[in-house]
């Protein structure tokens, strides 16, 4: 629906711009198959802010992938794209963002991407009924976290081209992509559909710190969660929406330890959240993904149990995690 005060043309341009951001971000899944030197944007002209966003995303967001595949850091990339500043809709003043009459009830809240881990669980705990819970390719963990918050879980489906799996099985390059950027872009499109003007994330302070250095170059496994990435994403959103959409993390000032101490105050979420790598596999089915259980052996499980242990009795700890990995 066109928002009150928006022309149909403006709304169409906004939706087209948001879809463009999804395509630019999601392209990282396919770029990594061969990491080509030339990257061509063939979906028409893009704004300067989108160009800055996508260049940085495919550089810093793919450095972990490059390092683990023994590729140059930074990757050698030459861009073929056309910039058209006239694509941006007229900017509106924040606080005066109009919404569709039929979506006003949903617009009372902020759209929160829910992965099911401790960060999104805490965001829902903080926002309460002001949150609109949203997930992509729903599994047991986000369903459980949304239910613990007393919220309906809105969903979207993302399907990777099956050819990508074929290439992987034949030995194509594979590895980490900036998933948070893909999730944020899809969430922005979903926010517009639900009448929300904010996409609220749960990215913490340490996400802005490099996780390793390669040849003097910073590599950050969590770059897509960093403050720099957030600012670049907001710049691109401003360019395509005229200020109608905002994204930010309410956990940005806090450390992992502080987030753990905050989560223990919500008993419902303590029994619902799941921060386990085995629950988020793509091609490989796991019990953790299907049933929402902890494997207790992946780096994420080890880190999370270590963060939570000081705040829980041994009995409560074992109830939540189904074991005692710190003693095994």
What are these regions (language model features)?
Residues 1-109, 126-161, 195:
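RNA-binding accessory domains that recognize and position tRNA/RNA substrates
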Residues 29-42, 191-199, 308-319:
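Short helix-capping/linker segments at secondary-structure and domain boundaries
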Residues 85, 98, 300, 308-328:
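Long, compositionally biased intrinsically disordered regions
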Residues 137-275, 279-291:
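ATP-dependent adenylate-handling ligase core
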Residues 277-279, 291-306:
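Local cysteine-cluster metal-coordination motifs and their immediate loop/turn environment
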């Amino acid at each position: 629906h066109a928002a009150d005060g928006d022309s149909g043309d403006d709304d169409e341009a906004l939706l087209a711009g948001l879809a463009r951001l999804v395509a630019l971000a999601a392209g990282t899944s396919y770029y990594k198959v061969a990491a080509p030197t030339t990257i061509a944007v063939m979906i028409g002209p893009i704004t300067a802010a989108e160009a800055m966003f996508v260049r940085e995303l495919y550089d810093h967001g793919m450095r972990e992938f490059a390092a683990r595949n023994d590729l140059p850091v930074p990757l050698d990339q030459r861009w073929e794209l056309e910039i058209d500043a006239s694509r941006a809709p007229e900017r509106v003043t924040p606080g005066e963002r109009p919404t569709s009459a039929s979506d006003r009830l949903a617009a009372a809240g902020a759209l929160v991407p829910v992965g099911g881990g401790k960060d999104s669980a805490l965001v829902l705990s903080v926002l309460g009924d002001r949150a609109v819970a949203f997930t992509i390719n729903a599994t047991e963990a986000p369903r459980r976290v949304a239910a613990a918050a007393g919220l309906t879980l809105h969903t979207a489906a993302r399907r990777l081209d099956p050819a990508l799996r074929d290439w992987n099985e034949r030995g194509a390059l594979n590895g980490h992509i900036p998933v948070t950027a893909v999730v944020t872009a899809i969430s922005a499109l979903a926010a517009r559909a639900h009448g929300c003007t904010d996409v609220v994330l749960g990215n913490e302070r340490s996400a802005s710190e490099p996780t390793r250095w390669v040849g003097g170059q910073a590599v950050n496994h969590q770059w897509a969660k960093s403050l720099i990435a957030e600012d670049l994403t907001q710049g691109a959103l401003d360019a395509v929406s005229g200020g109608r959409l905002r994204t930010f993390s309410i956990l940005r000032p806090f450390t992992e330890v502080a987030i753990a101490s905050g989560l223990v105050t919500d008993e419902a979420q303590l029994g619902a959240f799941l921060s386990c790598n085995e629950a988020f596999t793509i091609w490989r089915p796991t019990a953790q993904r299907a049933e929402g259980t902890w494997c207790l052996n992946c780096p994420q499980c080890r880190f999370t149990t270590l963060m939570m242990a000081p705040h829980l009795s041994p009995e409560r700890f074992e109830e939540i995690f189904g074991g005692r990995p710190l003693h095994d």
